[in-house]
Swiss-Prot record:
Responsible for synthesis of pseudouridine from uracil-55 in the psi GC loop of transfer RNAs. The gene is truB. Pfam families: TruB_N. NCBIfam families: TruB. This is tRNA pseudouridine synthase B. One of its GO terms (molecular function) is RNA binding. It comes from the Bacteria.
Length: 305
């Protein structure tokens, strides 16, 4: 059975690593060209988009935002910044109102500097931080800039010191770090109790399936795959209308365009990728506009000659 290119939106179960999911999909679809769009910690459940075939080349062009719903437990600090780690300190937490707690959360909204957890996949001197941490090595991670587009306080249980938040953020944001840092701001401690990713890279739960769904219906596995072009709806399209243009494109040559068309159409930006398609809406690749030369220059070409 020939595998269809595109994206599977896996609703990952607890305890399964992102790499485990990729291995299972490779086996189920009998194809090697499979990759995920970003690591989801084993204890985190929810959306894990997986690219199949040529779709792996388009991962960088997907929307990068992600949305989580998480619970934070105040009063506890662990070596992993989540409840599954070793407890290293415990303190009481302030019995403050929802409004006051939301004011403290303001410090995490917008563009912020965040130090990743030491048990994380961040590279330090060519090695993953979690490997150094498991060897009890002493090291520091540098703060990184991340963007929190939305942070909503959904519930606050003063008695048990548990809050539930919804976070829409940039790739590379650690909700565990928010839990840890919120505890410090409140003159307490904090760790992540549980976390669910409800959207990633433009996909959400409505598109999602369990790996068990594929196992039950392998013959119709193609029906679960979202075409690559559908995952790129956020990118402006340019249609190659002649065979000559398509041949130019597939041989890696720039496409001459009427620059007035782009100047009149405000959806195009020379800094942003352009989705190149043919008249039948078949995806041909990704290009970038060169205003000075009135060209679309190929960046990614499918079916190159």
């Amino acid at each position: 059975m020939e595998t269809k290119d595109g994206f599977l939106v896996i609703n990952k179960d607890k305890g399964c690593t992102s790499h485990d999911c990729v291995k299972q999909i490779r086996k189920l679809l009998n194809t090697k060209k499979v990759g995920h769009t970003g690591t989801l910690d084993p204890e985190v459940i929810g959306i894990l988009p997986i690219a199949i075939g040529s779709a792996t080349r388009f991962i960088q062009y997907l929307p990068q935002g992600k949305t989580y719903i998480g619970q934070i437990k105040l009063g506890i600090r662990t070596n992993t910044d989540d409840i599954h780690g070793e407890i290293i300190n415990q303190k009481s937490w302030p019995k403050i109102s929802d409004e006051k707690l939301d004011q403290y959360l303001n410090r995490f909204r917008g563009i912020i500097k965040q130090i990743p957890p030491k048990v994380s996949s961040v590279h330090i001197n060519g090695e993953r931080a979690y490997k150094k941490s498991f060897r009890n090595e002493v090291f520091e991670l540098a703060p990184r800039e991340v963007k929190i587009d939305e942070l909503t306080l959904m519930k606050w249980d003063q008695i048990n010191g548990i809050l539930e938040i919804k976070v829409k953020c940039s790739a590379g944001t650690y909700i565990r770090a928010i839990a840890r840092d919120l505890g410090e701001i409140l003159n307490s401690e904090g760790c992540l109790l549980q976390l669910k990713r409800i959207s990633a890279c433009g996909f959400d739960e409505q598109n999602s399936i369990k790996i068990s769904d594929i196992e039950k219906d392998k013959k119709n596995s193609k029906n679960f795959i979202i075409p690559t072009i559908s995952a790129l709806n956020h990118i402006s399209s340019f249609v190659l209308s002649t065979e000559e243009q398509i041949n130019f494109w597939q041989t890696g040559r720039a496409i001459r365009v009427d620059i007035n068309y782009f100047q009149e159409n405000k959806s195009f930006d020379y800094k942003k990728p352009i989705k190149v398609i043919d008249k039948k809406q078949i995806l041909l690749g990704i290009g970038f506009l060169n205003e000075e030369q009135s060209n679309i220059n190929p960046k990614l070409v499918l079916n190159a000659k």
